């Protein structure tokens, strides 16, 4: 079957939840037996989000094939079974880089390079490549209609609609209906103007998804349909809800999926959303609440740890527990001491880069180890646990990472200079390599040690997990750490790199070099997060000795 396209644009304001809407629609269509993928087009000039500040952009989501992508791809993978790849996310910077590289090679035969047709053609080619092999490709365009940066993308999707035919394309526009409490009514004018702007660019939306705090009266729906040139049934209300996992059922109840399949002429069964009903039921029926202390560097923006936040919630769902995350700035631990960690049921130190707040993270790992509090370290969270153990248990008082102290005389963590990539080829890096695109990144094989906590949690001896790091445990000093009691329970494919460590004389102290949060989903959870939340419940209820 020829791929069908659903283009999702946004208007009025940013951060309306286009990614959630796209993911929810994809979940319904997948539940109807269709093969669905989702693309995210980002109008910013950066080649990818890999070197962008998490405070500005949120987390960098890593795919199996090692792409550093927008956090919306995390939403997509949590909603559908399709795994995202490098083809599912590209930016203006990536498009221009490729066009300029083609120009330098002479691919354009001396033509004058212009936004139309060269940039718009490149965008279309990437959209088609990303959707190839799937029944439906939902394409989310970042930003807001009217932004200068978005114009080449809007022109590209307009042209693509003409090329593939109107029966193979749907334009879905997400807008805001502000509710004025003083007047007691929703205002439709911003939506009308947003659609007017979109139509001025040659795109007539087929579906309007309207965000609102309240229900939309029928007369307002009629008005929106009339002034925006869509049918009344194509005006979909996306009301604020207390759980994003209720949205698939909310959209299905309004017939959004039926509009799409009829437009595309597809014959497919009704959607079975029983798995999502189960997720919503698990959220509503919890018997415990645990507090997880997340000690990090970017705590002022929770989206910097979006996948970790969601994975913790998923772990809670599978343990009938609601999870409350207490964000703790690691610098505050340095200034105020570990007393601010009191009262938490478990401690998590997530990934990060840079020296700021590093000693606070080390103190958090020490506090968890000494006080027998469940600890999960991720990436840098494993490295600080190694440093803390080396200093305070193994007797390496000057232990540190060369990331933070280049001339450290006891470097228990150092730069990886050589490793096997996802294809089995050897990759090499030096201290002089660029920051962008030079990490050990993507899914890697890990061997688990039988009898370990992680082996029991995963239930298998080999796993694949996603990485994003430059530094690793120094194997030259590893024997000293192991003699002091540290246990390596996970090794890389060639068994040269430490992937997981545990402290055996502790109720639950586990740290991984990889990022387990990237593969956690609300329907399945993740072994490490399920185990971590269970340990938090056990600690809270005094089940640990």
From Swiss-Prot:
Region called Amidoligase domain, residue ranges: 1-266
Binding of CTP, residues: 14, 147-149, 187-192, 223
Domain of life: Bacteria
Disulfide bonds: none
Keywords: ATP-binding, Glutamine amidotransferase, Ligase, Magnesium, Metal-binding, Nucleotide-binding, Pyrimidine biosynthesis
E.C. code: 6.3.4.2
Active-site residues annotated for this sequence: 379, 515, 517
Catalytic activity, as annotated: UTP + L-glutamine + ATP + H2O = CTP + L-glutamate + ADP + phosphate + 2 H(+); L-glutamine + H2O = L-glutamate + NH4(+); UTP + NH4(+) + ATP = CTP + ADP + phosphate + 2 H(+)
PROSITE patterns listed in its UniProt record: GATASE_TYPE_1
Positions that bind ATP: 15-20, 72, 239-241
Pathway, per record: Pyrimidine metabolism; CTP biosynthesis via de novo pathway; CTP from UDP: step 2/2
List of residues binding Mg(2+): 72, 140
A biological process from GO: pyrimidine nucleobase biosynthetic process
Amino-acid positions noted as binding L-glutamine in the UniProt annotation, renumbered to this chain: 352, 380-383, 403, 470
Summary of activators and inhibitors of this protein: Allosterically activated by GTP, when glutamine is the substrate; GTP has no effect on the reaction when ammonia is the substrate. The allosteric effector GTP functions by stabilizing the protein conformation that binds the tetrahedral intermediate(s) formed during glutamine hydrolysis. Inhibited by the product CTP, via allosteric rather than competitive inhibition.
Single annotated GO MF: glutaminase activity
KW ATP-binding (keyword) present: yes
Domain spans labelled Glutamine amidotransferase type-1: 291-542
Any Pfam family: CTP_synth_N
Assigned protein family: Belongs to the CTP synthase family.
Note: CTPSs have evolved a hybrid strategy for distinguishing between UTP and CTP. The overlapping regions of the product feedback inhibitory and substrate sites recognize a common feature in both compounds, the triphosphate moiety. To differentiate isosteric substrate and product pyrimidine rings, an additional pocket far from the expected kinase/ligase catalytic site, specifically recognizes the cytosine and ribose portions of the product inhibitor.
Subunit and interaction comment: Homotetramer.
Xref: NCBIfam families: PRK05380.1, PyrG
Protein name: CTP synthase
Annotated organism of origin: Psychromonas ingrahamii (strain DSM 17664 / CCUG 51855 / 37)
This protein's encoding gene: pyrG
């Amino acid at each position: 079957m020829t791929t069908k396209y659903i283009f999702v644009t946004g208007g009025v304001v940013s951060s309306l939840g286009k990614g959630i809407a796209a993911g929810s629609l994809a979940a319904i269509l997948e539940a109807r037996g269709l093969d669905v993928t989702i693309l995210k087009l980002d109008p910013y000039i950066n080649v990818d989000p890999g070197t962008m500040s998490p405070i500005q952009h949120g987390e960098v989501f890593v795919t199996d094939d090692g792409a550093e992508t927008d956090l919306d791809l995390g939403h997509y993978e949590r909603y559908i079974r399709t795994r995202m790849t490098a083809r599912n996310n590209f930016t203006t910077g990536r498009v221009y880089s490729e066009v300029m590289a083609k120009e330098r090679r002479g691919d354009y035969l001396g033509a004058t390079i212009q936004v139309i047709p060269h940039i718009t053609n490149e965008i279309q080619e990437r959209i088609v490549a990303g959707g190839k092999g799937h029944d439906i490709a939902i394409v989310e365009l970042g930003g807001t209609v009217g932004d200068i940066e978005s114009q080449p993308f809007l022109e590209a999707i307009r042209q693509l609609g003409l090329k593939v035919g109107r029966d193979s394309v749907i334009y879905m526009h997400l807008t805001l209906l502000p509710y004025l409490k003083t007047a007691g009514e929703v205002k439709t004018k911003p939506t009308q103007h947003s659609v007017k702007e979109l139509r001025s660019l040659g795109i007539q939306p087929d579906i309007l998804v309207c965000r609102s705090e309240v229900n939309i009266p029928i007369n307002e729906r009629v008005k929106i349909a009339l002034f925006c040139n869509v049918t009344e049934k194509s005006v979909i209300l996306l009301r604020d809800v207390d759980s994003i996992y209720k949205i698939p059922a909310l959209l299905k109840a309004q017939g959004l999926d039926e509009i799409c399949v009829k437009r595309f002429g597809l014959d497919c069964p009704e959607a079975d959303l029983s798995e999502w009903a189960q997720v919503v039921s698990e959220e509503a029926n919890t018997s415990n609440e645990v507090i997880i202390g997340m000690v990090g560097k970017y705590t002022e923006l929770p989206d910097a740890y979006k996948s970790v936040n969601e994975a913790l919630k998923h772990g809670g769902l599978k343990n009938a527990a609601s999870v409350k995350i207490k964000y703790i700035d690691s610098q505050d631990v340095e200034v105020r001491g570990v007393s601010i960690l009191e009262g938490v049921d478990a401690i998590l130190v997530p990934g990060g880069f840079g020296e700021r707040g590093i000693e606070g993270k080390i103190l958090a790992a020490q506090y968890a180890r000494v006080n027998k509090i469940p600890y999960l370290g991720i990436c840098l969270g494993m490295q600080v646990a190694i440093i803390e153990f080396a200093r305070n248990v193994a007797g390496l008082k000057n232990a540190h990472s060369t990331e933070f102290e280049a001339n450290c005389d006891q470097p228990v963590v150092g730069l990886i200079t050589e490793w096997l990539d996802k294809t089995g080829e050897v990759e090499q890096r030096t201290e002089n390599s660029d920051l962008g695109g030079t990490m050990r990144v993507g899914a890697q094989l890990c061997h688990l040690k039988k009898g370990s906590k992680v082996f029991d949690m995963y239930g298998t001896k080999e796993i694949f997990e996603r990485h994003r790091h430059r530094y690793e445990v120094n194997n030259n000093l590893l024997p000293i750490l192991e003699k002091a009691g540290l246990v390596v329970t996970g090794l890389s494919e060639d068994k040269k790199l430490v992937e997981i460590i545990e402290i055996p004389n502790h109720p639950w102290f586990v740290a991984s070099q990889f990022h387990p949060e990237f593969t956690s989903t609300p329907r399945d959870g993740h072994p490490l997060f399920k185990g971590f939340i269970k340990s938090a419940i056990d600690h809270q209820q005094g089940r640990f000795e």
